[in-house]
Swiss-Prot record:
Residues 162-176 have a biased composition (Basic and acidic residues). Disruption phenotype: Cells produce only 2% of the novobiocin. Transcription regulator that specifically activates expression of genes involved in the novobiocin biosynthesis pathway. Binds 5'-GTTCRACTG(N)(11)CRGTYGAAC-3' DNA sequence. One of its GO terms (molecular function) is DNA binding. This is Transcriptional regulator NovG. The gene is novG. One of its GO terms (biological process) is antibiotic biosynthetic process.
Length: 318
């Protein structure tokens, strides 16, 4: 995450930045991913009435979306200001979200426990290689809480995770053991060093896999076999939580306080997709004499939503 001068952006470096560049308020957009579940009217009023110079807000250069400082932006609008001080940052959407979480924790209103858990879940999806402790430090949660969230998460698993010190370490070793077993099945005479290098595991793990296979046992430990049995079930539950997404959209002031925004929310409210099971139940319940009409209406609705999606996607890439 860098600024226009290719300097590394951190909460500490931004805290020391008291001067940005003046930007038109009308050119800025709210975050695409909300860290905070809603705005505090009282906090906006306090900021609007303060005589102190507030720190510049942080904005992602590529999208013009606010990374940190929505309350300051709302306060500026409340005062009738036409522009606001901005510090621009560059980076991927995933890294921008992490920075937003760090900045929200560093100053301003504290995030609630649910907000921090939601942030941790999203970081697990975008940074699955991060260790529990690294995510815990970023979100202000206990490492045990992050571990619990990860165990129930639908995010994919990775062979290695990056800790707070930046070093990469093996995860549970399941994938590495499977690679080692496959290699030894093809070449039983492979040396431990060859297995270690090809499978990305330690010499001790490679030795244990070879010993297990020679005894006729599975390459995975009992605990790892139990984890593997749970993976297919987790995969079936994967997919966006549209209920949570819609709840965040309902709290976005740019939608809540405009006629077109409220119209969009009403449309979305009646269009949030259900689970596969729920859709199957609805399909089973449609009377035979209504099926043709329902099919036509469903396809028309799908086409209309696809048209809207295409228009929005075109604007993002313009």
């Amino acid at each position: 995450m860098t600024n226009s001068g290719d300097e590394e952006i951190t909460p500490a470096s931004l805290k020391a930045t008291r001067k940005g560049e003046r930007v038109s308020i009308g050119s800025l957009l709210p975050p695409s991913e909300l860290v905070r579940s809603g705005e505090s009217t009282e906090h906006i009023r306090v900021l609007a009435e303060t005589d102190e110079d507030l720190p510049p807000i942080v904005v992602h250069r590529g999208t013009r979306r606010v990374v940190d400082g929505m309350h300051r932006l709302w306060a500026a609008r409340f005062r009738g200001d036409e522009s606001i001080e901005v510090v621009f940052v560059d980076g991927s959407p995933a890294d921008v979200f992490v920075l937003a979480v760090e900045l929200n924790r560093a100053h301003g209103l504290p995030l609630t426990l649910d907000e921090r858990k939601s942030a941790a879940a999203q970081i697990m999806d975008s940074h699955p290689h991060w260790s529990d402790r690294k995510i815990a430090r970023t979100t202000g949660l206990a490492a045990s809480t992050v571990a619990s969230l990860r165990s129930s998460s639908t995010a994919g698993t990775v062979g290695r995770r990056t800790g707070q010190d930046g070093r990469s370490r093996p995860n549970d070793g399941t994938d590495g053991r499977q690679r080692a077993a496959a290699l030894l099945a093809r070449n039983p005479n492979a040396s431990l060093r060859e297995v270690t290098r090809a499978a990305g595991i330690s010499v001790g793990t490679a030795s244990d896999v070879r010993a297990r296979l020679r005894r006729g046992e599975p390459a995975l430990t009992a605990r790892q076999q139990a984890v593997m049995k749970l993976r297919p079930a987790a995969a079936q539950r994967s997919g966006p939580d549209y209920g949570r997404v819609l709840e965040n959209l309902r709290k976005d002031p740019s939608l809540r306080f405009t006629d077109l925004g409220r119209r969009l929310l009403r449309l979305l409210d009646g269009s949030v997709p259900g689970s596969v099971e729920q859709i199957a139940q609805i399909a089973d319940g449609v009377p035979e004499h209504c099926r043709t009409v329902v099919v036509d209406m469903a396809r028309e609705c799908a086409a209309a939503w696809q048209h809207l999606a295409d228009q929005l996607a075109d604007r993002d890439t313009a």
